[in-house]
């Protein structure tokens, strides 16, 4: 069963009861994170979900309210003794942006793999599902994501 949780939907500045943008999906014991705004870790803990099964982090774009929670999350994953690779998916510039944020998390016990999106629409075959990325209209290059399981799409 696919489980979804909107961890945050605020913009620009976190508020006490409104964290910045992030959504987590769980399927077959694995988790996907879409965006990682400030407060993402708090939202995951409030939901009672675990960090360790996060295998994929997708970014829609690189405004701060969508990426500012990443350094802390990487440190938390490292402290959880994660050794499995972490896949990150996002628009062009992904590796440069992530590596700039890793200044405070330079030594991690797991590798990070990067998949930069270049086409208007791309489908990525995952373990038991498909992740479809598609361009959306914004003032910077931006993607939306659909999780496809069989004939169901979310």
Say what each PLM segment does:
Residues 38-89, 116-118:
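Active-site metal-binding motif and surrounding structural segment of the metallo-beta-lactamase
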Residues 14-17, 127-151:
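Active-site-proximal loop/helix segment associated with metal-binding centers of metalloenzymes
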Residues 49-52, 110, 129:
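Structured loop/turn residues at beta-strand edges in well-structured enzyme cores
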Residues 1-2, 122-131:
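Beta-strand-turn-beta hairpins that frame and shape the catalytic cleft
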Residues 1-47, 145-147:
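Conserved beta-strand hairpin/beta-sheet module of binuclear metal-dependent hydrolase folds
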């Amino acid at each position: 069963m696919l489980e979804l949780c909107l961890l945050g939907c605020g913009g620009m500045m976190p508020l006490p009861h409104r964290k910045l943008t992030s959504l987590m999906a769980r399927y077959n014991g694995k988790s996907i994170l879409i965006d990682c705004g400030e407060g993402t870790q708090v939202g995951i803990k409030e939901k009672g979900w675990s960090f360790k099964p996060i295998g994929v982090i997708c970014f829609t774009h690189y405004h701060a309210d969508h990426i500012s929670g990443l350094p802390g999350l990487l440190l938390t994953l490292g402290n959880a003794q994660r050794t499995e690779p972490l896949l990150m998916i996002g628009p062009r510039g992904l590796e440069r942006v992530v590596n700039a944020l890793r200044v405070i998390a330079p030594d991690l016990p797991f590798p990070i793999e990067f998949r930069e999106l270049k086409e208007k629409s791309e489908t990525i075959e995952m373990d038991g599902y498909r992740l479809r990325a598609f361009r959306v209209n914004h003032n910077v290059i931006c993607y939306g994501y659909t999780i496809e399981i069989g004939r169901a799409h979310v």
